[in-house]
Amino acid sequence: MGGLEPCSRLLLLPLLLAVGGLRPVQAQAQSDCSCSTVSPGVLAGIVMGDLVLTVLIALAVYFLGRLVHRGRGAAEAATRKQRITETESPYQELQGQRSDVYSDLNMQRPYYK
């Protein structure tokens, strides 16, 4: 099984469980338990049903997402840009390089040059 792709291995697992005739695993200490056991075929069916439902949900989301009108997003982006340009920035704009702010530090510690 080293050469199979992960998808092929995943599809092969329920087949091996159902055809292999594996008995449900029971703990020896709980042999007097009146619990119901789950056969490998039922377990494989649950796993396969879950995988099918997951794929169907993913496909439904994909196709419903494609149906959304794309022009609406462009109109929202234009109004958003307009709102951004109208809003005044609360930050002070940068000024040019000012060497006088840190000039006294160079005189105190010349070994950092």
From Swiss-Prot:
Chain residues that bind Ca(2+): 50
UniProt KW Membrane keyword: yes
Signal peptide: 1-27
Post-translational modification: Following ligand binding by associated receptors, tyrosine phosphorylated in the ITAM domain which leads to activation of additional tyrosine kinases and subsequent cell activation.
Membrane spanning stretches: 41-61
Stretches with biased composition (Polar residues): 87-100
Subcellular location: Cell membrane
Region called Disordered, residue ranges: 75-113
Similarity field: Belongs to the TYROBP family.
Name of this protein: TYRO protein tyrosine kinase-binding protein
Native organism: Pan troglodytes (Chimpanzee)
